[in-house]
Amino acid sequence: MFKMVSSPHTHGTNLTAKFMLWVIVAMLPALIVQIAFFGTGVVIQLAIALSMAIVIEIVVAKLRHKSTTFYLADLAGVVTATILAMAIPPYAPYWVVMIGMIVALLLAKHCYGGLGQNLFNPAMVAYAFLLISFPVQMTSWLPSFELLAEPPTFKDAWLLIFKGVTSDGFTSRQLLSGIDGIAQATPLDSAKTSIAKLGFDGVIQSPIFSGIFARGWLQLNLAFLAGGLFLLYKRIIHWQIPVAMLVVFSVLSALTDLVTMHTHLNVLSQLFSGAMMFGAFFIATDPVSASITPKGKLIFGGLIGLLAYLIRYYGSYPDAIAFAVLLANLCVPLIDHYTQPRLYGTHK
């Protein structure tokens, strides 16, 4: 028997796998930029993450008596693996991304019932778990390669990830020993801990900054921005979430900068020195864990911008995107409940 469904009975060509494939394509420019400025470690992390995704999806399919490729065909696991691999430090130990993929796919996705059922963004659940559980490994970012006397080769990247040392016996921390002014994980970390003493002008004179922008991070964020605009053009994502998120964050940051007189990085530095563009276009726009109503998307995006601002400026973690997205995910059922569009023909 056929299941009765309401009309119109039209076939949509935009399958889940097609949407996911466009997201992957949109992340390729940022992946290339990350390799160029931060090395080939991200390629190895991505390979590990993809391998784990394939294994986990096959195991879960078998446990649920599905076909082997049942959970692989939609490419959702591939997108999660790509986001997580690009979010963690390129030279983090191999077991970090392996644990992260287990948390992302098993705990944050399949324990909720699989694709379309999860309350939280799986990649951000894994990232937050890793950051809390392994803070040293998750803050082991190397600066842009132009600051390193001997940038790690692919062989060195492999050895750093699997053995913790390069072919010359250097750890990732030792690779920084010849660079003055670098004592923290990322430009946002460095600025947060030193701006009170050095001031804004002193911070941007650090080697990790080129003008008001962090070396490598500006190009990476521009690549994510380009990919996000491509997704908007292809109508894979909606404009409300990234626009609301960036506008709210920018306005609050600008007002704070006016009031506190350069005790924080300025708005442009904040937008292009961390994961803001990555979060706005590729993380916050997750179609499952984000709001689904037009007004709800604006509220959801604005809430992420507000939370990211509060955590960055007044919290202990300088980037804040993961925690802001997860906290906003908690509010999605409430947001959707109160922002349902009025049915045609009904009274306001």
From Swiss-Prot:
Question: What family is reported?
Answer: Belongs to the NqrB/RnfD family.
One Gene Ontology BP term is: electron transport chain
Q: What biological function has been recorded for the protein in this entry? A: Part of a membrane-bound complex that couples electron transfer with translocation of ions across the membrane.
Q: Which cofactor does it need?
A: FMN
Presence of the UniProt keyword Electron transport in the record: yes
Provide the coiled-coil residue spans.
none
Predominant cellular place of this UniProt entry's protein? membrane
Keywords in alphabetical order: Cell inner membrane, Cell membrane, Electron transport, Flavoprotein, FMN, Membrane, Phosphoprotein, Translocase, Transmembrane, Transmembrane helix, Transport
UniProt keyword Phosphoprotein present: yes
Looking up InterPro entries in the UniProt record yields: NqrB/RnfD, RnfD_bac
Which EC number applies? 7.-.-.-
Write down what this protein is called: Ion-translocating oxidoreductase complex subunit D
Q: Which NCBIfam families does this entry report, sorted A to Z?
A: PRK00816.1 (NF002011), rnfD (TIGR01946)
Q: Which domain of life is it from?
A: Bacteria
